[in-house]
Amino acid sequence: MHILLRSLLKEIEQDQSEQSPLKYQFYCDMDGVLVDMDGGFKKISGGLLPKDYEAKNGKNSFWKIVNQHPNFWIELEPLPDAKVLWDYIKDNFKTPPPVILSAGQGNRIVEQKTAWIRKHIDPSVQVIIANSGVNKPQYIINSTEPNLTHILLDDTNKNITAWENSGEGRIALLHKNGADSIKLIQSIISK
């Protein structure tokens, strides 16, 4: 997987002579884009994904089981292509992209998610805490700056829809894997 991503990056770099101008502000989701939250959850839930666990055990059962594991967020593993994806994002936007994440339930989660980003992705990255995924548009930087397009990379359909419906100059990309997301980003910034 890493070899495929690295060869894709080399191909894109050959097609791109310079970085994207400051006409884009990029935002990257954390869970499911950079961190393997599903894999970590399966370890504590008997192999079930969060949606399956909640279907079986009730709507708030996700938070109940996660809260029984005080270091859940900090102990999660990066997705295999997270670093390559992040390096591509960071290298192709003049304004350093923030990671925008959902706070979930409580300060401990915010602290652990922020520490995870600092440890695994970039110690200097700006972390924006949204109170929920669908509220991420409320945290857009320079939202009134003309000719500035705000791009969100997220793995959740409802967050994508909320971002795109939040105003002019909003593009949301549905993350499936690093290679596909890099291609999507490249298709936008190369225009």
Each model region followed by its residue ranges:
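Charge-dense, intrinsically disordered terminal/linker segments
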Residues: 1-24, 78, 115, 187-191
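Active-site neighborhood of HAD-like aspartate-dependent phosphohydrolases
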Residues: 12-67
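Short coil/turn segments at beta-strand junctions that form active-site/ligand-binding loops
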Residues: 22-24, 96-97, 147-150
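Short catalytic/ligand-binding loop motif for oxyanion handling, primarily in non-cytosolic enzymes
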Residues: 35-37, 42-43, 98, 107-111, ...
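Substrate-recognition element of Asp-dependent hydrolases with the DxDx(T/V) motif
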Residues: 73-78, 82-117
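Hydrophobic/aromatic residues located in beta-strands of well-ordered beta-sheets
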Residues: 97-98, 127, 172
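Substrate-recognition "cap/lid" segment bordering the active-site pocket of phosphatases
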Residues: 101-150
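Acidic, Mg2+-coordinating phosphoryl-transfer loop and its flanking beta/alpha structural elements
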Residues: 147-189
